[in-house]
Amino acid sequence: MHYIRELLIVVFTSCPALSYAHSSLDGSRYCRCQPGEACWPSLADWQALNSSIQGNLVEVRPIGHVCHEPTYNKAACERVSKLSSNGTWRANQPGAQQEYAWEVSLSRNESCYVGPDNPTEPCSQGRIPRYSAMVETTEQAQKAIMFARERQLRLVIKNTGHDSGGRSSAVDSFQILTQRLKDITFIPEFTPTLGLAEGTYKSKGPSVRIGAGVLTKELYAAADEHGYTVMGGECATVGIAGGYIQGGGVSTALTPMLGLAVDLVQEFEVITAEGRHVIANEFQNQDLFWALRGGGGGTFGLVTSVTMPVFGAMPAVISELTFESQEPGEPFWRAVKEVIYATRDLSTGGNSGQYWIGRGPTGSYFVRLTLFFIGEMDTGKMGGKVGSLLSALQDQEIGFHLNSTAYDRLSSFLAIPQGEFVGGIAFHQENILIPRGFYDSPEGPAELVNRLAEVKLNPGDMWVANALGGKVMANKDSVDNAMHPGWRTAAVLLVGNRIFEPVLEAQRAVQERMTAVEGPLLHSLGPPGPVAIYLNEADADLENWQEWFWGEKYNRLRDIKRKWDPDDLFLVRHGVGSEDWDEEGMCWIQMSIEECPVREPSQCTCPSFGCPMRHVPGLL
């Protein structure tokens, strides 16, 4: 017995700890500081931080608190209710996410929904942070990071709050909001910062440096004004430099031609867990540069800017074909199969496209196919390009509408904000990457249609499929980053979106159905089956997420994470290293001594707030 006690002391003291936060005496967990504990910052501490960042610290309540007693305010509640769908407004609110799902805490049964219907219903903090540093400069962000590090707080980074996995919110957390970092700088001849590298480097041509808080619509508008085309997504209120680009970055219009957004990144500016402001590119901090390109947002540091190339004006014809059906019978699903064939064939020719299969608010089913013909200006040719599809629809006696518009600059189309007022929707997502081999097989498209037909869609639910292939596949041997190798064989990204009523029971039901029923239904497609899952639009309860998101690259990501952030200050749900922590990233889960991430146990580096007690097999 004395031997066991002495051994435990050795195991504990082999991990140098700077200070201890709350700990459980069973030896299984060590936790970050939480409200109500002695280690939680005092009011004076918060005031000192506020002064050091020029008054940009705020105490946070959920945006819906004005709709609930005891803080109910009828006028304020009506105002918040009207603004709730505005994604730009939500991006700027530290007490909001873009999706209701990540404002609530299912584990605690805590919610604070927006709306005047139930003012007597309790309003709880949920996953909304306790405080937010709404930083305006790199220096302010550095001070906020060091405060979180020194005080052992659960830190979250919010860019805009667009995240299907809950990465930008957490229970009892301290938030850094990057929305005020709005710099957009166009650089006629960009040369990466060489650091210690010797010699000179040829210019990479025109580029743009994008601050962490820049929204997609802001970047598109600025690029169009300067005569450039730039890579980005389709939702106007997504932040470019945050999880979008660090998780991969798909562009409906440009990905088949240019690749993933992350494939184009030339340089990052990053604040590390030590509070250092560093540059990561192909010449310096190359391992960090590799990890940031696909390793996920909020994980390796706080990105303050990203630099990527811009392109000249691109003429384009954009065609949209729509049809609907009150009942999704065999003719409807045969028509869907023809849409899949058409998208496959057109993307093979270098064009890009996206199709939606959904159910509208009245209950009818619809399909919307959007195709981008880059370099074209003659709308009269579009009927010929999709002629086989139109003939197939006519054979099925499916009425359709086709509209084509020519743009002398694709950038002028991209600058029209899309999806700006879809904030606050309660929905969950899931997705799969479908390989080219499956799409090209004789049975592939038919099998996919059969699986889609098996899933019951409720009003508001939809499938969205983006064409990949093209440059994404061509970059297999020329681009080395953290993206799952499956992207380099994928033809289509298929995303499922499921709407639910803003009540906890409905949220649980939808999440359970996606994880237990719909996910396995899609994962079993093939052969060849799904090759990967896009972490930015994934099932929040996905199992084996390390393999699905990163595959063989995960171990290298873990090593880089340990080097740059050994204390896991930057931590997100289903992010690199998060398996060592509980669901909320608050407490370190017991690990065996063999898992200590160093060569010798005596050199074990643990979080600065203390080392979790290591389990010694056969003794405990």
Swiss-Prot record:
UniProt signal peptide: 1-21
Cofactors that this protein relies on: FAD
Uses in biotechnology: Notoamides have been shown to exhibit antitumoral activities. Notoamides A-C show moderate cytotoxicity against HeLa and L1210 cells with IC(50) values in the range of 22-52 mg/ml, but the IC(50) value of notoamide D is greater than 100 mg/ml. Moreover, notoamide C induces G2/M-cell cycle arrest at a concentration of 6.3 mg/ml.
Sugar attachment sites: 50, 86, 109, 403
Superkingdom of this protein's organism: Eukaryota
Keywords, sorted A to Z: Alkaloid metabolism, FAD, Flavoprotein, Glycoprotein, Oxidoreductase, Signal
Enzyme Commission designation: 1.-.-.-
A molecular function (GO) term: FAD binding
Pathway(s) where this gene product acts: Alkaloid biosynthesis
Keyword Cell wall biogenesis/degradation listed: no
Catalytic EC class: oxidoreductase
Residue ranges of domain FAD-binding PCMH-type in the record: 124-313
UniProt entry tagged with the keyword Transcription regulation: no
GO biological process, alphabetically ordered: alkaloid metabolic process
InterPro entries recorded: BBE, FAD-bd_PCMH, FAD-bd_PCMH-like_sf, FAD-bd_PCMH_sub2, FAD-linked_Oxidoreductase, Oxid_FAD_bind_N
Role this protein plays: FAD-linked oxidoreductase; part of the gene cluster that mediates the biosynthesis of notoamide, a fungal indole alkaloid that belongs to a family of natural products containing a characteristic bicyclo[2.2.2]diazaoctane core. The first step of notoamide biosynthesis involves coupling of L-proline and L-tryptophan by the bimodular NRPS notE, to produce cyclo-L-tryptophan-L-proline called brevianamide F.
Family of this protein: Belongs to the oxygen-dependent FAD-linked oxidoreductase family.
Protein name: FAD-linked oxidoreductase notD
Organism for this UniProt entry: Aspergillus sp. (strain MF297-2)
